[in-house]
């Protein structure tokens, strides 16, 4: 048998397509459907950029191995694929190439679907989707209306993250180290209207339910989400302006709120700081209560990214004062760049002696530093901030308390005096979802002079994008369209303006896994049904990159909880198990066109075949670790497949696994059987918990080496019956070919481990003479102690000549020790 990858792979890809081999059953009853139940296997779907990269190939190879394994095991498997097809790259391509975003997107989808087929991925064809399909948009717009009616979507004006290159707003989660998550441009702040999802309403539940995921999600992801939600308990209270400051502010403001997680430090407050965007600061600018230089500096602070504002501390004194709520001393007010409006109230009490940030600021501007907490075993110092817990002093009635007790007592004191209260704050902020781009799902609202913001009627959905647009990269094409935005108000039927912002593309990926559950029979009529959702969800294995830990994964959890509360489903969490695969590297760096270190999957398939690419990816490294591309290892994978295929001639044709009398076999034949079944046991462990495909494949290679040491055709046939079943999820084309020729595909099913192969006929024991290891002996497993000693004496005879054995010790299953004297 000569291995021809092109011929084999084309044959089986056509067979699978013709026989609809990967469509799940719609019969959900255990009696007539799949008795073992369901498995929902899902990889994070791709943006249709035009060509798959090796990161994609790794992602989908892992999920495909899971899907094929569970089909063999008798489960009803849903393994769908789709395309996250809205987004800015399509518009950027339109500007660069003069192509329409829609054409560019769907041409790329067609090409990538061909790549999926050429790699042998076992996706359900009936449930393919693209999030830019009008049907998908229709259902999503309906959900948006439901969320608006529930009070979970609102519109307000505020300072937003703005990417000057992408010309659109970014959510907080999409700003990475002060830069745009997509194009890496520096992000600035811009004052504008924005739609928000009330994700903060679910902050407590999103945090608490992380405990439900501890057995199935990587700890790193759980920690990242916990830190992003950032729940903190503390004291909220108001600071009151003194008479002079009230007068300066025209009596428009008499107080402002601050929040602190360290109420035990309150006696050490030496200044208060406002965010540049704070309403008091804005009022002073609008009413010329500060000079032009100050106004200019404040504008610079506003335009800086949140990351930049945390680096170099800067501030401006406002010549305002507030009264300390306990000591009644005056506290100066500053504008400080490190204070952000999207945490707490946009105002902080500053305690330089016990906060490093406040300390740096105070040192820079020569502000007082007053220590009020000292270490339990030492004195206080003002050379650096003491941020640990300690003992209070110079704190009136709270002197001598430790920090933890003092926090509780001080909060109680504020509540008794009705000047403050215990409060919980979150770093998590509401999710801003409107984008000033064309290629996205239109937000289904209109602006009416008489009625305000009005929801579109559901019978008018979808609100589809116009195709006759011009994309220049300047401004929002929908805003500039001559007719599309003009419409009638759904409420009063007067002239109105359609909302021209489109949805953040993370909205589409927040529910696509639910859409895949829809029955193809009702695909056009409903987004999904409760019956289908109840059967398929949650996703049993979800595979994707860790870079989505606080974007997609958090948003998907939020949408699931919202949909539950809207009555669409009855569970809390969407993904039972999460596998975050490592990056694919070449020359020690992440693959990228700019570095010139990419590998084209099409070229690998052309030269070696899809099975080689799949085998290398699963064998080179465990899926959670980084994978270093190695051309020699790819060549090695190809050679193994070639040998595996060609040596199948040693197996005889049969429709059942051969029955073998193990006791009658030679030592080499028994060893070969043992190695085959060891590989089978390893495969069960891989799909259960470990995910170490490399150890499973290594086990198959060991079995092949053992098989080559014997010639029994029954042993070869049994081995190939099992090994092709083990390897079919990894190299499906060649295994399907071997199985069809030798076993009529009967063996691609769950295999039974034969325990007798692990029972050893003999044992190897070490023999020591006066404590020195001299040789090894092989003894029958059932040998008596006298028989073992007889064999040991014979094997060690040359060390015993002329000597007297004075003691013989047998350590069961380990060694024989002979003690001698001259």
Curated annotation (Swiss-Prot):
Disulfide bond entries: none
The enzyme's E.C. designation: 6.1.1.4
InterPro entries registered for this protein in UniProt: aa-tRNA-synth_I_CS (IPR001412), Leu-tRNA-ligase (IPR002302), Leu_tRNA-synth_edit (IPR025709), Methionyl/Leucyl_tRNA_Synth (IPR015413), Rossmann-like_a/b/a_fold (IPR014729), tRNAsynth_Ia_anticodon-bd (IPR009080), Val/Leu/Ile-tRNA-synth_edit (IPR009008)
Reaction(s) catalysed by this chain's protein: tRNA(Leu) + L-leucine + ATP = L-leucyl-tRNA(Leu) + AMP + diphosphate
Pfam families found in the cross-reference section: tRNA-synt_1_2, tRNA-synt_1g
Residue ranges annotated as motif 'KMSKS' region: 590-594
Gene3D superfamilies linked: 3.10.20.590, HUPs, Isoleucyl-tRNA Synthetase, Domain 1
Record: residues binding ATP: 593
One GO MF term attached to the UniProt entry: aminoacyl-tRNA deacylase activity
UniProt motif ('HIGH' region) ranges: 46-56
Protein localization: Cytoplasm
Annotated GO biological process: leucyl-tRNA aminoacylation
GO CC annotation, single: cytosol
Keyword annotations of the record: Aminoacyl-tRNA synthetase, ATP-binding, Cytoplasm, Ligase, Nucleotide-binding, Protein biosynthesis
Assigned protein family: Belongs to the class-I aminoacyl-tRNA synthetase family.
Designated name of the protein: Leucine--tRNA ligase
The species this protein was found in: Sulfurimonas denitrificans (strain ATCC 33889 / DSM 1251) (Thiomicrospira denitrificans (strain ATCC 33889 / DSM 1251))
């Amino acid at each position: 048998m000569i291995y021809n990858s092109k011929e084999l792979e084309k044959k089986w890809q056509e067979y699978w397509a013709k026989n609809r081999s990967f469509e799940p059953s719609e019969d959900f009853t255990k009696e007539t459907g799949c008795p073992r139940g369901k498995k929902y296997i899902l990889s994070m779907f791709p943006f249709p950029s035009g060509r798959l990269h090796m990161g994609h190939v790794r992602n989908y190879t892992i999920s495909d191995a899971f899907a094929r394994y569970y089909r063999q095991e008798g489960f009803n498997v849903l393994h769908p694929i789709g395309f996250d097809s809205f987004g800015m790259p399509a518009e950027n391509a339109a500007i660069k190439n003069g192509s329409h975003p829609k054409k560019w997107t769907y041409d790329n989808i067609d090409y990538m679907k061909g790549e999926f087929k050429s790699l042998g991925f076992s996706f359900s064809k009936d449930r393919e989707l693209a999030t830019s399909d009008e049907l998908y948009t229709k259902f999503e717009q309906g959900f948006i209306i439901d969320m608006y009616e529930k009070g979970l979507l609102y519109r307000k004006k505020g300072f937003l993250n703005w990417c000057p290159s992408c010309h659109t707003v970014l959510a907080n989660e999409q700003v990475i180290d002060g830069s745009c998550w997509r194009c890496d441009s520096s992000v600035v702040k811009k004052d504008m209207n924005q739609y928000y999802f009330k994700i903060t309403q679910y902050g407590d539940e999103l945090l608490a339910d992380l405990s439900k995921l501890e057995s199935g999600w990587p700890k790193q992801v759980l920690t990242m989400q916990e830190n992003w939600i950032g729940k903190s308990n503390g004291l909220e209270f108001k600071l009151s302006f003194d008479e002079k400051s009230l007068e300066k502010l025209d009596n428009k403001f008499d107080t402002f709120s601050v929040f602190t997680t360290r109420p035990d430090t309150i006696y050490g407050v030496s200044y208060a700081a406002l965010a540049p965007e704070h309403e008091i600061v804005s009022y002073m600018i609008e009413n010329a209560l500060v000079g032009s230089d100050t106004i200019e500096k404040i504008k610079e602070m506003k335009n800086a990214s949140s990351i930049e504002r945390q680096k170099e501390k800067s501030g401006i004194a406002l010549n305002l004062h507030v009264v300390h709520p306990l000591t009644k001393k005056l506290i100066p007010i500053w504008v400080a760049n490190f204070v952000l409006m999207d945490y707490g109230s946009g105002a902080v009490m500053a305690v330089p002696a016990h906060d490093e940030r406040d300390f740096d600021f105070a040192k820079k501007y020569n502000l007082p530093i007053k220590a009020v907490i000292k270490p339990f075993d030492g004195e206080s110092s003002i050379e650096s901030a003491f941020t640990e817990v300690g003992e209070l002093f110079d704190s009136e009635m709270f002197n001598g308390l430790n920090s933890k007790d003092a926090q509780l007592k001080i909060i109680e004191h504020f509540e008794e005096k009705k000047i403050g209260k215990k409060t919980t704050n979150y770093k998590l902020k509401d999710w801003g979802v409107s984008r000033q781009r064309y290629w996205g799902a239109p937000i289904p609202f209109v602006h009416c002079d008489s009625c305000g913001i009005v929801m579109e009627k559901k019978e008018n959905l979808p609100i589809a994008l116009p195709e006759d647009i011009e994309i220049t990269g300047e401004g929002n094409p929908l805003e500039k369209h001559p007719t599309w935005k003009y419409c009638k108000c759904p409420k009063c039927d007067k002239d109105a303006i359609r909302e021209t912002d489109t949805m953040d593309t993370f909205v589409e990926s927040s529910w696509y896994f639910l859409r895949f559950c829809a029955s193809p029979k009702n695909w056009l009529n409903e987004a999904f049904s409760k019956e289908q959702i109840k059967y398929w969800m949650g996703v049993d294995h979800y595979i994707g990159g860790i870079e989505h830990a606080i974007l997609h994964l958090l948003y998907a959890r939020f949408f699931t909880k919202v949909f539950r509360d809207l009555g669409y489903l009855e569970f809390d969490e969407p993904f039972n198990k999460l596998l975050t695969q490592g990056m694919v590297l070449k020359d020690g760096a992440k693959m990228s066109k700019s570095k010139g270190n990419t590998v084209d999957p099409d070229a690998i398939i052309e030269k070696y075949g899809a099975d080689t690419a799949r085998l290398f990816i699963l064998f080179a490294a465990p899926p959670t670790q980084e994978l270093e591309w190695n051309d020699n290892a790819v060549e090695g994978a190809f050679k193994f497949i070639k040998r595996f295929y060609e040596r199948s001639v040693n197996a005889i044709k049969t429709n059942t696994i051969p029955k073998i009398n193990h006791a009658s076999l030679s030592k080499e034949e028994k060893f070969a059987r043992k190695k085959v079944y060891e590989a089978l046991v390893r495969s069960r462990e891989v799909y259960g918990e470990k995910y170490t495909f490399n150890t499973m494949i290594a086990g198959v290679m060991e079995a092949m080496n053992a098989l080559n040491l014997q010639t029994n055709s029954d042993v070869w046939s049994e081995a190939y019956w099992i090994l092709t079943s083990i390897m079919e999820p990894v190299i499906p084309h060649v295994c399907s070919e071997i199985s069809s020729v030798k076993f009529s595909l009967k063996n691609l099913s769950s295999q039974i481990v034969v325990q007798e192969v692990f029972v050893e006929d003999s044992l190897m024991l070490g023999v020591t003479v006066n404590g020195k290891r001299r040789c090894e002996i092989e003894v029958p497993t059932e040998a008596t102690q006298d028989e073992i000693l007889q064999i040991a004496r014979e094997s060690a005879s040359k060390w015993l000549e002329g000597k007297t054995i004075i003691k013989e010790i047998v350590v069961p299953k380990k060694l024989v020790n002979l003690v001698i004297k001259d």
